[in-house]
Amino acid sequence: MGRQAEFWSESKNNSKIDSQPKAKSRFASKRPNGTINTHPQERMRAANQQEE
Protein backbone atom coordinates (compact mmCIF):
# COMPACT_ATOMS: atom_id res chain seq x y z
CA MET A 1 0.00 0.00 0.00
CA GLY A 2 1.34 3.43 -0.93
CA ARG A 3 1.95 6.27 1.49
CA GLN A 4 -1.08 8.21 0.22
CA ALA A 5 -3.37 5.21 0.78
CA GLU A 6 -1.92 4.65 4.26
CA PHE A 7 -2.55 8.28 5.21
CA TRP A 8 -6.12 8.16 3.91
CA SER A 9 -6.81 4.89 5.72
CA GLU A 10 -5.45 6.24 9.02
CA SER A 11 -7.45 9.45 8.80
CA LYS A 12 -10.61 7.53 7.93
CA ASN A 13 -10.23 5.09 10.81
CA ASN A 14 -9.35 7.80 13.33
CA SER A 15 -12.25 10.10 12.50
CA LYS A 16 -14.79 10.73 15.23
CA ILE A 17 -18.25 12.19 15.09
CA ASP A 18 -18.11 14.86 17.77
CA SER A 19 -20.23 17.56 16.18
CA GLN A 20 -24.00 17.93 16.13
CA PRO A 21 -25.90 16.52 13.13
CA LYS A 22 -26.49 19.02 10.34
CA ALA A 23 -30.12 18.02 9.79
CA LYS A 24 -32.47 20.36 11.55
CA SER A 25 -36.18 19.98 12.23
CA ARG A 26 -36.89 23.39 10.71
CA PHE A 27 -35.80 22.00 7.32
CA ALA A 28 -38.07 18.94 7.54
CA SER A 29 -40.71 18.73 4.85
CA LYS A 30 -44.14 19.57 6.19
CA ARG A 31 -47.61 19.61 4.76
CA PRO A 32 -49.51 22.90 4.55
CA ASN A 33 -51.39 22.01 7.75
CA GLY A 34 -48.07 21.57 9.61
CA THR A 35 -48.06 17.78 9.93
CA ILE A 36 -45.13 15.61 8.90
CA ASN A 37 -45.43 12.40 6.89
CA THR A 38 -44.26 9.93 9.54
CA HIS A 39 -45.79 6.75 8.10
CA PRO A 40 -44.88 6.58 4.39
CA GLN A 41 -45.29 2.79 4.21
CA GLU A 42 -48.93 3.01 5.26
CA ARG A 43 -49.52 5.72 2.65
CA MET A 44 -47.90 3.61 -0.08
CA ARG A 45 -49.94 0.55 0.92
CA ALA A 46 -53.15 2.57 0.82
CA ALA A 47 -52.27 3.97 -2.61
CA ASN A 48 -51.72 0.48 -4.01
CA GLN A 49 -55.07 -0.90 -2.81
CA GLN A 50 -57.19 -1.79 -5.82
CA GLU A 51 -60.84 -0.85 -5.70
CA GLU A 52 -63.17 -3.43 -7.19
Swiss-Prot record:
It comes from Bacillus mycoides (strain KBAB4). Residues 1-52 are annotated as: Disordered. The gene is sspK. GO terms for biological process: asexual sporulation; sporulation resulting in formation of a cellular spore. Keywords: Sporulation. Induction: Expressed only in the forespore compartment of sporulating cells. It is found in: Spore core. This is Small, acid-soluble spore protein K. Its main location: other. NCBIfam families: PRK03081.1, SASP_sspK. Belongs to the SspK family.
